[in-house]
Amino acid sequence: MASATLTAWIKMPSFLKKILKLRGRRQEDESRSRMLSDSSMLSCRVNQLTSEGTEAGSTTPSTLPKDQALLIEPKVRAKEKSQHRRPKIIDQVRRVESLGEQASQRQKHMLETLINKIYTGPLGEELVQTLYLRIWAMEETPESLKILQMREDIRDQVLKMKTERWLRTLIRGEKTKLKDFQKRYEEVHPYLMKEKVEQVIMEEAWSLAAHIVQE
């Protein structure tokens, strides 16, 4: 069969041989072009997937090998848990609206009376003057500087509100006893070491509220 084909090729006119050779080269070129085209399309698709993954933020566990995905998932869960954690002491200090609501009736009445005097009577004027002088005399901090530069009426209102917050922090629960009073101070002590202005205000609130505490 091969010898017959070879004999036919030898006997074939030269112009036909040229035509067949050109056709063969054309087929090879077309085949090579298709291969290059397929390779180019595959490369574009890979680049597109990579770009989409980058725009999404990061590679998801589903696109990673199984062992790497198992390592990433606990880290993600740990990060989510840490985001939900909040410092309990600071929350307790800053949450004003719920403090003092569960005090005993007698203590609650005394607490509200004291707060009313701070906002409406001479006790409040004496309080803000004392706080202003103590803050002025202390070592300068960004918070103390901010308060000292306030307009007088605004500063007085801010100091009264901060004092009220501390009063409601210290006097709360079914019945606040002296040991509870001391314990609440210890709870917020780390916070006060960083916030010297708050420490001064808390000390004045402590002094004002001491008569409410039952032995």
Curated annotation (Swiss-Prot):
The different isoforms interact (via C-terminus) with unphosphorylated and phosphorylated human STAT1 (via N-terminus), favoring the formation of parallel STAT1 homodimers. The different isoforms do not interact with host STAT2. C protein interacts with L protein; this interaction has an inhibitory effect on viral transcription and replication. Keywords: Host cytoplasm, Host-virus interaction, Inhibition of host innate immune response by virus, Inhibition of host interferon signaling pathway by virus, Inhibition of host STAT1 by virus, Inhibition of host STAT2 by virus, Interferon antiviral system evasion, Viral immunoevasion, Virion. Belongs to the respirovirus protein C family. InterPro entries: Paramyxo_C. It comes from Sendai virus (strain Z) (SeV). Residues 12-34 are annotated as: Disordered. The P/V/C gene has two overlapping open reading frames. One encodes the P/V/W proteins and the other the C/Y proteins. Disulfide bonds: none annotated. Residues 15-22 are annotated as: Involved in self-degradation and in host STAT1 degradation. The disordered region at the N-terminus is involved in C protein self-degradation in trans. This self-degradation of C protein may play a role in the regulation of viral RNA synthesis. The disordered region at the N-terminus is also involved in the host STAT1 degradation in order to counteract the host innate antiviral response. This is C' protein. GO terms for cellular component: host cell cytoplasm; virion component. GO terms for biological process: symbiont-mediated suppression of host innate immune response; symbiont-mediated suppression of host JAK-STAT cascade via inhibition of STAT1 activity; symbiont-mediated suppression of host JAK-STAT cascade via inhibition of STAT2 activity; symbiont-mediated suppression of host type I interferon-mediated signaling pathway. The different isoforms prevent the establishment of cellular antiviral state by blocking the interferon-alpha/beta (IFN-alpha/beta) and IFN-gamma signaling pathways. They inhibit IFN-alpha/beta induced tyrosine phosphorylation of STAT1 and STAT2. Blocking the IFN-alpha/beta pathway requires binding to STAT1 in the cytoplasm. They inhibit IFN-gamma induced serine phosphorylation of STAT1. Block the IFN-gamma pathway by binding to and stabilizing the parallel form of the STAT1 dimer, further inducing high-molecular-weight complex (HMWC) formation and inhibition of transcription by IFN-gamma. Y1 and Y2 proteins are produced not only by alternative initiation, but also by proteolytic cleavage of C'. Only alternative initiation is detected in vitro, whereas in vivo cleavage seems to be predominant.
